[in-house]
Amino acid sequence: MNKTADPILTIFTPAYNRAHTLPRTYESLCRQSCKDFIWLIVDDGSADNTAELVRDWQSRDNGFTIQYIYKENGGMHTAHNVAYANIHTELNTCIDSDDMLADGAVEKILRKWDEVKGKGCAGIVGLDADFDGKIIGKGFPDGLSETTISGY
């Protein structure tokens, strides 16, 4: 997929003193085959070197835009609220500060959205997996490809 002038996907990451784990998240975003997204990091009052790390990444040619917002510590839910108030793209997803995005995920998200956005869908849902690709928690029921929130 080609990069557009105005990405439709924001990947947001709430972070609090996570300079030791954020590089894994950053590296997974750099490995994406499609860089048509914005990475929004909401720093929830970190006292470590999170800000310096992000400033360094912002100065690099990563192929995607990195936005950084610092706020006073208030908990992850307040970081989510700040993220949602600052997201201006059609789609968004949250990647925690100690997680990584699977290779090719952005391309899959955007392709799937192209397939379903005209069908009255509000979004798409994926599952979390561990580093070996094993689904964390309960997977979707066999044969489920589309549903409504009330139908699940």
Please name every model-derived segment:
Residues 1-152:
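Nucleotide-sugar donor-binding/catalytic module of glycosyltransferases
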